[in-house]
Amino acid sequence: MRTAYLDCFSGVSGDMLLGALLDVGLPEAHLRAVVSALQLDGVTLEISRPVVQGFAATHVQVHVHHHEHDHVHRHLAEIADLLERADLDPAVRARALAVFTRLAEAEAAVHGTTPDRIHFHEVGADDALVDIVGTVAGLAWLGVDRLVCSPLPLTGGWVACAHGEVPLPAPAVCRLLAGVP
């Protein structure tokens, strides 16, 4: 069993995960091939290696070069179709779909509906697809079958999203973290 530990002292994001995977040996060419396999028009990766406060880092940005009237809205079935059409390893496809399914279940619970009726806003956008599928593919390439992370620094306040202003952590995030120490 190969375990990866994420030290999330300042939080975590898809771009941060992709950078960390590159730092521990995921070949850039493999990540770019995964992004290409998704067949998302106008999506590119910008990878840089800055020195931040004296420490080497890997910075990944997903650029979407077409207009997405705010965000693409996709249902779980559309994401499943997109993953099915992509030239991905079947295990990566299944794990990525499991991630999106878990997200749909959390969103459905807080919105009082079913997972198949959830339309993803931010998570259905092209950059989020790259973040999630790229992370799943990177973990698979590295042979990681167990992921552990430090406690997440949860904050308070409000954030604007497709449903208006919601409290932080967002209700679906709270649902995902239920029972996590």
Q: What function would you assign to each model-found segment?
A:
Residues 9-10, 37-39, 124-126, 151-159:
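Acidic, glycine-rich active-site loops and adjacent beta-strand->loop/helix elements
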